[in-house]
Amino acid sequence: MMDFDERVPVGSNMYLPGCTYYVSGTDFSSLPPFLPQTPSSCPMTYSYSTSSLPQVQSVREVSFRDYAIDTSSKWHSRGNLPHCYATEDMVHRECLSNPGTLGDMLSKNNSVLYHSNSSHTSNVYGSVGRNGVLPQAFDQFFETAYGNVENQPTEHPVDRATSKAPPPAESGSDSCRGTDETERCEETSSPEPSSGNNEDKFSGSSNGQKTRKKRCPYTKYQIRELEREFFFSVYINKEKRLQLSRMLNLTDRQVKIWFQNRRMKEKKLNRDRLQYYTTNPLL
């Protein structure tokens, strides 16, 4: 195949790759040359008269600005219907007859469509709108989109404050209900203490307010004696338990619960020790 620059007219000898001979140009004398350089070298006949058609400029001569911003002389359909437009629109159309740039046309079109009153200034870019970036022609969009939101906080501040006041009271009542329910659950779930510990069930019963039962930790002396007894016997009998309760000033139930918790703790320690020694073969 030949390159684009090496193409020659059909009038000269042309070599066809599929053939073994040259084709002379006399066989194609009725055809015009290949890719004519001028429009006049390739005349064409039309079934209609071309004199009635308007003269169209070349594509290279028409720029984007001339195409986008067209004067009123190019659009004949608008001039034929003057009765469909109001007088005010006609005045603005005259103002838009020769705009300078595409941005001026767009800004002025917006001013015609949305701000056609007499108080609107001709210099759109000189006056900046509410948003600080776009011209005043775009203020209507911000008024419709954000106007209601901006006006809402300043309408009824007192009503909003009064409407927000009741929820804390309800939350406080809910928290009180929650504390009452937890206290009831604790009372039902925990077994009743012995007769010697009934007086410290509620410390604030005289005030009429229910308070949580205070934890009474064991003293160092009590813990030392209990640990000593646990060292000799993990399971304590009833006689020894009563003896410890009288000696340490504790209830029988407190001593029993301490031994139960201590056995669970010892079991956990033994499990941890076994796991530690089995995972380390060097020990």
Curated annotation (Swiss-Prot):
DNA-binding region, residue range(s): 211-270
KW Cell inner membrane (keyword) present: no
Cellular component GO terms held in the UniProt record: nucleoplasm; nucleus
Keywords, alphabetical: Developmental protein, DNA-binding, Homeobox, Nucleus, Transcription, Transcription regulation
Compositional bias annotation for Polar residues: 188-209
Region annotated Disordered, chain positions: 150-215
TM stretches of this protein: none
Subcellular location: Nucleus
Pfam families xref list: DUF3528 (PF12045), Homeodomain (PF00046)
Positions of disulphide bridges: none
Biased composition (Basic and acidic residues): 177-187
Entry function: Sequence-specific transcription factor which is part of a developmental regulatory system that provides cells with specific positional identities on the anterior-posterior axis.
PANTHER family registered for this protein in UniProt: HOMEOBOX PROTEIN HOX-A11 (PTHR46092:SF3), HOMEOBOX PROTEIN HOX-A11-RELATED (PTHR46092)
Name of protein: Homeobox protein Hox-A11b
